[in-house]
Amino acid sequence: MTTKSAAKTGLIGLLISSFFFSTATTSRAIMDNPGTPASVAAWRIFLGGAGIGLYVLYKYGRKDFARILKIPVVWLLGSFTFVFQLAMFYAAPKIGVAVSALVAIGSSSFLAGLFSTIFGFGKPTKIWILSTVVAICGLTLLTGFNGNLEVTGILAALSAGLMAALFVVLGVNTIRTQKADGILVNGVFMSIGSMLAAPVALASGGWIDSTSDLLLILYLGPIATTLGNIFYGIGLHNLSPGTVTTIMLLEPVGATIWGIFLLDEQLTTQGLIGCLVILSALALLAYSESKKPIIEDLEEVGTLA
């Protein structure tokens, strides 16, 4: 049974998760000698995935870890975590970090709602549709989106959005069909992503040649990514796929705020309005979901099993 209390717990988990995830781009920007986007992404998944993997092994034990690891779709989802990072870090220099977030996170929210309907998790509510549309409009204002962008960058960001949507929908399905904790399932996903990223990370780590860069990588992996995914798992466990992806639109808002305080970036009036629009839309969604749980009884919803 998913209660109102559980829904609120899921929302809080996503808020904390988006805080940690929003620091990723800023961490790379303040490095002394940052490596290629692909290398930084690989190190992030390698260390962060290993961190949450060790955490869930300690908390849930080898038996539960192995039970989830034996599920074929889990390996597919593990690969999605790595492919998502590669796609995002490829798109960023092509079309910009902000627009990459707009395309990837915006499309993932729409696709997650669509997949939820197709796979029987319930039709999107009017509040979810309104909140998502308004939030994406706000994100468009925040990023200053324009049409002069490279097609390959757009396609990469859309691919990242597809990976994120499938990850959330199939991840929620795995949690329900296996009756497993969201942190455990997300931890196994990330452990697989860590194994896939390890060769790329270890082969491209020559740029980590200063104490500050080492400390930032250790923050980006074991702290931001590990802790971020622990709280993300709480959101996956308690909320619907569409709501998870829509609430995560907070991530680019957080990245913008970090850019202002740490990188001396300027926020235009249009960008400020965009931030306020996003926050208003997500506040509406969060209030609605905290009052009425998304899933009254997990036994009654559809699964992909």
Describe every region a protein language model picked out.
Residues 2-3, 45, 49, 213, ...:
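C-terminal-most transmembrane helix of multi-pass membrane proteins
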Residues 52, 81, 124-144, 164, ...:
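Hydrophobic transmembrane alpha-helices of multi-pass small-molecule transport proteins
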Residues 39-50, 89-122, 241-260:
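Specific alpha-helical transmembrane segments that line the substrate/conduction pathway
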Residues 53-99, 141, 221-239:
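Specific transmembrane alpha-helical segments of multi-pass solute transporters/efflux pumps
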Residues 22, 26, 78, 82-86, ...:
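Hydrophobic/small/kink-forming positions within alpha-helical transmembrane segments
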Residues 1-43, 48, 79, 83, ...:
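Glycine-/small-residue-enriched transmembrane alpha-helix faces in small-molecule transporters
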Residues 6-11, 34-42, 66-71, 144-163, ...:
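Juxtamembrane helix-entry segments on the extracytoplasmic side of multipass membrane proteins
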Residues 30-31, 40, 44, 91-92, ...:
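Hydrophobic/aromatic residues within transmembrane alpha-helices
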